[in-house]
Amino acid sequence: MNLQGKKITVHDMTLRDGMHPKRHLMTLEQMKSIACGLDAAGVPLIEVTHGDGLGGSSVNYGFPAHSDEEYLGTVIPLMKQAKVSALLLPGIGTVDHLKMAKELGVHTIRVATHCTEADVSEQHIALARKLEMDTVGFLMMAHMNSPEGLVRQAKLMESYGANCVYITDSAGYMLPDDVRARLGAVRDALKPETELGFHGHHNLAMGIANSIAAVECGATRIDAASAGLGAGAGNTPMEVLVAVCDRMGIQTGVDVWAIQDVAEDLVVPIMDFPIRIDRDSLTLGYAGVYGSFLLFAKRAEQKYGVPAREILVELGRRGMVGGQEDMIEDTAITLAKARASKAQKVAA
């Protein structure tokens, strides 16, 4: 398909999804320098919150170095052209968090639910529209629903007031044909004025290919992260996406060279470990497991002696979804007991 001249909005995830591999411990200085670099490079929309969205600070998800208010209050006044977004998961974030974000100057709110649970987003989407915010519905783990099922969920979000709906490959499981089937169906079903977005992860190295497939299907908003900093093997790498789009004639408004410098000079140096496709993040994509489970599974491996890969495969078999982080430990304990029992039988 010829995409020459097509315009898209690239939406940066470095300071939100990138909080997962940073264990939510980014400093305010790191936030400032990266946000300003992205802004100067021409990135139009930058997400800033705890990795699990507004209100994510908890025992279950992890305590951040600073509050959402501090992060947002630090970044927003510095932006010269970029707008700032925030993620909100109903049940974690509340309407009070939403109002706080609006007061601080957040432009875009993304209300995220599991891909079969759009009905829990009504209160938050309706309020965001009432507050005249750019309001996005965000359907996570989209590989776990059929194209027809996603159409029903997307239309619910649209009916509540979302002016954009995202199909989100939280596990990095989808292949380009999966993306085309789902986004194509949703694009056909939504009103022409309702935007379509795609959020990818790079666990099967499909981030770029899937994003381009999404654009082919009519997506106008594409998520990516500088140097791919995000859960699992990371998000679609922003600097690569921008370069590919430039080659294809897709207009992003982002400077090809400046965005490379942000990745190389600002983001890579703050990584606690390389964001790459290792056996555990590859397992996330292969088994269709929620990306932010990775570090939890690695911690459980250290604690219970069960390989993270085994834990992740079992989580995938059980169909665990975002929000069930407590079940990772439970699963590891169950597998450890099974291993011990098997070892005893062999010894006997």
Curated annotation (Swiss-Prot):
Residues 8-260 form the Pyruvate carboxyltransferase domain. Coiled coil: none annotated. HAMAP family: HOA. One of its GO terms (molecular function) is 2-isopropylmalate synthase activity. This is 4-hydroxy-2-oxovalerate aldolase 2. NCBIfam families: 4OH_2_O_val_ald, PRK08195.1. PROSITE patterns: PYR_CT. Keywords: Aromatic hydrocarbons catabolism, Lyase, Manganese, Metal-binding, Plasmid. One of its GO terms (biological process) is L-leucine biosynthetic process. Belongs to the 4-hydroxy-2-oxovalerate aldolase family. The active site is at H20. InterPro entries: 2-IPM_HCS-like, 4OH_2_O-val_aldolase, Aldolase_TIM, DmpG_comm, DRE_TIM_HOA, PYR_CT. Mn(2+) binds at D17, H199, H201. Gene3D superfamilies: 1.10.8.60, Aldolase class I. It is an enzyme of class 4 (lyase). Pfam families: DmpG_comm, HMGL-like. Substrate binds at R16, D17, S170, H199, Y290. Its EC number is 4.1.3.39. The record marks R16 as: Transition state stabilizer. PANTHER family: 2-ISOPROPYLMALATE SYNTHASE 1, CHLOROPLASTIC-RELATED (PTHR10277:SF9), HOMOCITRATE SYNTHASE-RELATED (PTHR10277). It comes from Burkholderia vietnamiensis (strain G4 / LMG 22486) (Burkholderia cepacia (strain R1808)).
